Amino acid sequence: GFIMEFAENLILRRMEDPK
């Protein structure tokens, strides 16, 4: 789906860039 991909992208970005 679209929402799932969007959420996954956000999570991946947050995990890669923890601040």
Curated annotation (Swiss-Prot):
Catalyzed reactions: a ubiquinone + NADH + 5 H(+)(in) = a ubiquinol + NAD(+) + 4 H(+)(out)
Chief localisation class: mitochondrion
EC supergroup of this enzyme: translocase
EC number: 7.1.1.2
Cellular component GO terms held in the UniProt record: mitochondrial inner membrane
Transmembrane segments: none
Membrane topology: Peripheral membrane protein
Compartment(s): Mitochondrion inner membrane
Keywords: Membrane, Mitochondrion, Mitochondrion inner membrane, NAD, Oxidoreductase, Translocase, Ubiquinone
UniProt superkingdom: Eukaryota
InterPro entries xrefs: NDUFB11
Translocase among keywords: yes
GO molecular function: NADH dehydrogenase (ubiquinone) activity
Subunit structure: Complex I is composed of about 30 different subunits.
Role noted for this protein: Transfer of electrons from NADH to the respiratory chain. The immediate electron acceptor for the enzyme is believed to be ubiquinone.
Record's protein name: NADH-ubiquinone oxidoreductase 11 kDa subunit
Organism of this sequence: Solanum tuberosum
Phylogenetic placement of the source organism: Eukaryota, Viridiplantae, Streptophyta, Embryophyta, Tracheophyta
